[in-house]
Curated annotation (Swiss-Prot):
Matching NCBIfam families: pyrH_bact (TIGR02075)
Reported function: Catalyzes the reversible phosphorylation of UMP to UDP.
InterPro entries associated with the record: AceGlu_kinase-like_sf, Asp/Glu/Uridylate_kinase, Uridylate_kinase, Uridylate_kinase_bac
Pathway(s) of this molecule: Pyrimidine metabolism; CTP biosynthesis via de novo pathway; UDP from UMP (UMPK route): step 1/1
Official protein name in the record: Uridylate kinase
Subcellular location field: Cytoplasm
Length: 240
């Protein structure tokens, strides 16, 4: 059995990652693949927390740009993350992996409310904990949720899984063939150069709490495990 480099991780999944190539909605094949990858690392006794975005179903910024009240649009986005989280929980439990969804907005009929100490206890019992509904506050992204929850549960690393890129580049590799991929970066580099890794609030939170971040592609099966056991994949962001 491979020895994991990290004992407790936060896996950040964008909503788009769950949509796969169809671009929106929830792709059952993709979510099953992600669940299998999570099972691989859970079987290494890694404590796994997951933060899921909602962009495959709804984006608060899109609603705001169309004239909606920003807070209302963001709350709709939080509800989208709950739908994604329940879908992921179902896929995990189909594979025999115990999991719990905790929401920042109370909806006790479908999930537990977020309680930090309870989340940590679930992790210690090797249950996968899925954090849904963002931070529970409008104007904050699910990237910031991942940074906040990682700090709260004292995670060793954030694994940021992307579905359309395999790391951080100095330009969009889909538009610029000369784009160069970074192997390592500091959070100050990310903030100073305006690199599209995560928003500035999330980057600052990770930097202040010294939480390393690995950005990699979710589309290649086995990549989550490769990141956890310390193989060099994607881009690692750490320190000042």
């Amino acid at each position: 059995m491979e020895k994991p480099k990290y004992n407790r991780i936060v896996l950040k999944l964008s909503g788009e990652a769950l949509a796969g190539e169809q671009g929106n909605g929830i792709n059952p094949t993709v979510i099953q693949s992600i669940a299998k990858q999570v099972k691989e690392i859970a079987e290494l006794d890694v404590e796994v927390a997951v933060v899921v975005g909602g962009g495959n179903l709804w984006r608060g910024k899109t609603g705001s740009d169309l004239g909606m009240d920003r807070a209302t649009a963001d709350y709709m986005g939080m509800l989208a993350t709950v739908m994604n989280s329940l879908a992921l929980q179902d896929s995990l439990e189909t594979l025999g992996i115990q999991s719990r969804v905790q929401t920042s907005i109370e909806m006790r009929q479908v999930a537990e409310p977020y309680i930090r100490r309870k989340a940590i206890r679930h992790l210690e019992k090797k249950r996968v904990v899925i954090f849904a509904a963002g931070t529970g506050n409008p104007y904050f992204s699910t990237d910031t949720t991942a940074a906040l929850r990682a700090a709260e549960i004292e995670a060793d690393v954030i694994l940021m899984a992307k579905n359309n890129v395999d790391g951080v580049y100095n330009a969009d590799p889909r538009k610029d063939e000369s784009a160069v991929k970074y192997e390592k970066l500091s959070y100050l580099d990310v903030l100073k150069d305006g690199l599209e890794v995560m928003d500035s609030t999330a980057s600052s939170l990770c930097m202040d709490n010294d939480i390393p971040l690995i950005v990699f592609s979710i589309m290649e099966e086995g990549n989550i495990k490769r990141a956890v056991i310390g193989e060099s994949i994607g881009t690692i962001v750490r320190g000042k």
